[in-house]
């Protein structure tokens, strides 16, 4: 066998059995996805063996390095890159037994102070905060939380600058972490009424970019209601209610006016009797006096004269027997006790 053939056979055999000659290929297509502070390293590797493992070394610029091994072709290195203000260099090496490949490196950072387009192949990013929209006439109102309230990272305690693009027109805005909400107004043409429009929102905070899209449907404007009819209806209703109240009052007045009045003569008798009873009654006591229901007894003129004499203390006149007899004869002719004199 010629020398040239032996060399060719050795190269082929070394490629097929790299562990025999100490040749271990390096990982390829190494990339890192750093988004929302979740950092995952990916790579490819051809013809791995049962003994193939990968060593990942994370070297922060401002803190000590850490190394971890895995047999997978990806690794979440978020727990090894928690400081979002630092710059990270990642070294990846393949191991097959005692042999190892050459290192493959990649850099990433969230910090604008460390980012260098020549050194950092990938630029870390964040999701734009959830956007709320509402339409009022010819304005779309946009609101969302400041990124610091969403991610709670000290690096984000600063101004958040963002821009909104609509219909090829871009407007810049800004807000700070102490504001409850970031608010913006986007004016649109009434010609888009009844259609949906797309808003593109792009923001940057601490040098970290974020963006999102929002579709907003603009409703058709509703015609203004003619208030003349409403006012007329209210006035008409009030008039009807007023007439009902007036009719009710009129019915009550008619009812009260039909109550019969007390005759004038009866009213005079009741008034006189009440006055007489008030004069003749003694001082009021707790026991109510009982009034007689019989006919009233009236004193004659003679009885009144006798009573008057008794009051003055004068002696009564002497009456003869003839006079007494005459009076008795006259008294026998009366059938009523009302004419008979009363003697006490």
From Swiss-Prot:
InterPro entries referenced in this protein's UniProt entry, alphabetically: FN3_dom, FN3_sf, Ig-like_fold, Type-II_Cytokine-TF_Rcpt
GO cellular component, one term: plasma membrane
Cellular localization per UniProt: Cell membrane
Transmembrane in keyword set: yes
Membrane-side (Cytoplasmic) residue stretches: 251-344
Domain of life: Eukaryota
Residue ranges crossing the lipid bilayer per the database entry: 230-250
Tissues of expression: Highly expressed in brain. Also detected in spleen, heart, intestine, gill and kidney. In immune cell populations, detected at low levels in monocytes, peripheral blood leukocytes, splenocytes, neutrophils and mature macrophages.
Extracellular side: 23-229
UniProt main location, coarse: membrane
Keyword annotations from UniProtKB, A to Z: Cell membrane, Glycoprotein, Membrane, Receptor, Signal, Transmembrane, Transmembrane helix
Conditions for induction: Up-regulated in response to ifng1 (interferon gamma 1) and tnfb (TNF-alpha 2).
Annotated ranges, domain Fibronectin type-III: 24-102
Lipid bilayer topology: Single-pass type I membrane protein
GO molecular function: cytokine receptor activity
Residues of the signal peptide: 1-22
UniProt-annotated stretches for the region Disordered: 300-344
Pfam families: Tissue_fac
Residues carrying sugar: 29, 44, 132, 189
Function: Receptor which shows binding specificity for the cytokine ifng1 (interferon gamma 1).
Family: Belongs to the type II cytokine receptor family.
Name listed for the protein in its UniProt record: Interferon gamma receptor 1-like
Natural source organism: Carassius auratus
Record gene name: ifngr1l
């Amino acid at each position: 066998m010629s020398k040239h053939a032996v060399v060719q056979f050795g190269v082929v055999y070394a490629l097929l059995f790299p562990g025999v000659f100490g040749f271990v290929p390096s990982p390829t297509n190494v990339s890192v996805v750093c988004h929302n502070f979740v950092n995952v390293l990916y790579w490819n590797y051809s013809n791995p063996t049962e003994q193939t493992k990968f060593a990942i070394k994370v070297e922060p610029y401002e803190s000590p390095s850490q190394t971890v091994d895995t047999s997978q072709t990806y690794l979440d290195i978020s727990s090894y890159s928690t400081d979002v203000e630092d710059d990270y260099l990642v070294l990846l090496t393949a191991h097959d037994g005692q042999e190892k490949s050459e290192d493959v490196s990649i850099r990433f950072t969230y910090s604008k102070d460390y980012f260098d387009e020549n050194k950092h192949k990938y630029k870390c990013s964040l999701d734009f905060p959830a956007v709320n929209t509402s339409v009022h006439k010819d304005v779309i109102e946009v609101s969302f939380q400041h990124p610091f309230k969403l991610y709670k990272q000290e690096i984000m305690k600063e101004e958040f600058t963002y821009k909104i693009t609509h219909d090829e027109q871009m407007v810049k805005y800004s807000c700070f972490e102490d504001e409850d909400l970031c608010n913006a107004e986007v004016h649109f043409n009434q010609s888009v009424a009844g259609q949906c429009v797309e808003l593109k929102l792009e923001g940057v905070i601490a040098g970290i970019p974020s963006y999102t899209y929002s579709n907003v449907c603009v409703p058709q404007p509703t015609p203004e209601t003619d208030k003349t009819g409403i006012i007329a209806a209210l006035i008409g209703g009030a008039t009807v209610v007023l007439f009902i109240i007036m009719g009710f009052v009129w019915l009550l007045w008619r009812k009260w006016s039909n109550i019969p009045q007390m005759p004038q003569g009866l009213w005079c008798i009741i008034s006189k009797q009440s006055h007489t009873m008030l004069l003749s009654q003694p001082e009021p006591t707790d026991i109510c006096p009982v009034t007689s229901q019989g006919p009233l007894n009236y004193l004659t003129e003679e009885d009144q004269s006798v009573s008057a004499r008794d009051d003055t203390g004068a002696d009564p006149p002497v009456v003869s027997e003839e006079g007494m007899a005459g009076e008795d004869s006259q008294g026998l002719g009366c059938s009523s006790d009302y004419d008979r004199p009363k003697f006490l």
